[in-house]
């Protein structure tokens, strides 16, 4: 079994390398038209440059997974701004995509928690479609629309989960099929459990991203890992790639939903024990605060387990 690991957005080891530099609408609205355009271009350019820096860092450390920042392009979905961010940066987007393909990286996006399809408000669904389209446009500009995925949560319950899930069934129809085909769903830490999210994934043919930390914080009484994991694998069968699992650990016993700086191996070991009988490859996205540093430390700790072998900076051959 081969387990690969990746991190989110930026490498904390790198100096001043955030790919999510912001330009608020409040600031933008105070600028002249030309100044506003220049600010959009300048901020996006900086974020694309730092995305490249972060990718080179991952490659140099042999880390095979990476999640792009959703904030690469400022104000891309703001109703009063929405601008053509692809044309001025065709070269930069293609350079990123070429680098990803050349080194065989697995990449993804994670639109924010407001991108959901369970709301009773049509405007929320419209905004979700706009946001998913924005992320797809970036994948398309990188020529990665056949490789990358966009991961979101099911959404809110609004006091009635059954009705909310029925709205999901209807609202998701507004998402163009080619964009929905690049979508995954993840269980969350407060509302939709692993089993509930799996049910939606199986119904709609959407791959299931299992978040172990969320599962611990928001668990069905009868949800055994031994039952969840085989079903998770099944949702990825048609993709031809391993499933993805999110890894993090609680900041403290009281702050169980907050992410710690690193990943506590004792917290995640039950998951690895449950995965062992499956005998399948898995990719893991580290969601700890220290990102790349947390990843490298966890990989080192896991590879020290007798029988395991580290075969790359972010890859372990796990003893069957």
From Swiss-Prot:
Entry EC number(s): 3.-.-.-
Keyword Hydrolase assigned: yes
Keywords recorded for this protein, A-Z: DNA damage, DNA excision, DNA repair, Endonuclease, Hydrolase, Nuclease
Molecular function as annotated in GO: endonuclease activity
Keyword rRNA processing: no
Any Gene Ontology biological process: response to UV
Domain of life (superkingdom): Bacteria
InterPro entries: UvdE, UvdE_bac, Xyl_isomerase-like_sf
Gene3D superfamilies listed in its UniProt record: Divalent-metal-dependent TIM barrel enzymes
Annotated function: Component in a DNA repair pathway. Removal of UV LIGHT damaged nucleotides. Recognizes pyrimidine dimers and cleave a phosphodiester bond immediately 5' to the lesion.
NCBIfam families named among the record's database cross-references: uvde
Family stated for the protein in its record: Belongs to the uve1/UvsE family.
Protein name: UV DNA damage endonuclease
Species of the source: Bacillus pumilus (strain SAFR-032)
Taxonomic path: Bacteria, Bacillati, Bacillota, Bacilli, Bacillales
Protein encoded by which gene: uvsE
């Amino acid at each position: 079994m081969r387990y690969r690991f990746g991190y989110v957005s930026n490498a904390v080891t790198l100096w001043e390398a955030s790919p999510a530099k912001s330009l608020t609408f409040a600031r933008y609205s105070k600028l002249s038209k030309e100044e506003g355009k220049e600010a959009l271009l300048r901020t996006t350019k900086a974020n694309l440059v730092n995305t490249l820096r972060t990718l080179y860092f991952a490659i140099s450390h042999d880390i095979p997974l990476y999640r792009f920042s959703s904030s690469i392009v400022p104000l891309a979905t703001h109703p009063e701004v929405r601008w053509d961010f692809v044309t001025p940066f065709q070269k930069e987007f293609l350079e990123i995509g070429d680098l990803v393909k050349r080194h065989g990286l697995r990449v993804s996006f994670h639109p924010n928690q407001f991108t959901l399809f369970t709301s009773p408000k049509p405007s929320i669904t419209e905004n979700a479609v706009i946001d998913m389209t924005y992320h797809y446009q970036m994948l398309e500009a990188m020529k990665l629309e056949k490789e990358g995925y966009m991961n979101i949560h099911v959404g809110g319950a609004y006091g009635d989960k059954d009705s909310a899930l029925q709205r999901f069934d209807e609202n998701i129809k507004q998402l163009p099929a080619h964009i929905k085909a690049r979508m995954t769903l993840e269980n969350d830490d407060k509302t939709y459990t692993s089993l509930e999210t799996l049910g939606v994934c199986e119904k709609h043919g959407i791959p299931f991203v299992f978040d172990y930390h969320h599962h611990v914080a928001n668990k069905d009484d009868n949800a055994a890992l031994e039952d969840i994991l085989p079903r998770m694998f099944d949702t990825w069968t048609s993709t031809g790639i391993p499933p993805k699992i999110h890894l993090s650990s609680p900041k403290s016993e009281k702050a169980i939903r907050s992410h710690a700086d690193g990943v506590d191996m004792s917290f995640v070991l039950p998951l690895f024990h449950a995965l062992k009988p499956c005998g399948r490859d898995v990719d893991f996205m580290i969601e700890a605060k220290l990102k790349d540093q947390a990843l490298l430390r966890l990989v080192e700790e896991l590879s020290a387990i007798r029988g395991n072998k580290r075969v790359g900076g972010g890859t372990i051959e796990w003893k069957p």
